[in-house]
């Protein structure tokens, strides 16, 4: 995987992620591992500043382990390994998973038969911000 430090490559391999198809999604950002989030059409989401929506896996490991763009809400992660048409086919089971690395590892282990979609955290039940990062209290339903 180009543009990745050895420690980041090792981290991904330990978790079952080895595909060269993912080289544009994962990159080393200083000491941290950057993970670019893509829409189902393969184009990157944008954060509140207009930059690509990138979640960083912080190294060394601490709390938090991941850092999302400030003021940009949450985004689902759609893997470039997802077969075309999976989101439209209601006969394919949808599996929600916490985190992009696990999604990519699942597609490498089980390439067909399931539609894996990643969430940035299991506590994220409703994103209260719009695409520009603005919050409207009138639309906040506080799902539990």
Put a short name on every predicted segment:
Residues 30-144:
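Phosphate-handling DNA/RNA-contact segment within nucleic-acid enzymes
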């Amino acid at each position: 995987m180009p543009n990745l430090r050895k420690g980041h490559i090792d981290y991904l391999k330990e978790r079952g992620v080895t595909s060269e198809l993912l080289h544009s999604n994962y990159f080393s950002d200083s000491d941290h591992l950057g993970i670019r989030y893509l829409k189902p059409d393969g184009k990157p989401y944008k954060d509140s500043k207009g930059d690509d929506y990138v979640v960083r896996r912080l190294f060394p490991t601490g709390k938090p382990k991941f850092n999302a763009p400030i003021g940009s809400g949450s985004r689902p992660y759609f893997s470039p390994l997802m077969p075309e048409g999976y989101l439209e086919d209601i006969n394919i089971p949808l599996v929600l998973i916490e985190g992009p690395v696990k999604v990519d590892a699942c597609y490498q282990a089980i390439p067909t038969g399931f539609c894996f979609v990643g969430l940035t955290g299991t506590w994220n039940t409703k994103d209260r911000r719009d695409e520009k990062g603005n919050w409207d209290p009138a639309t906040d339903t506080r799902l539990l």
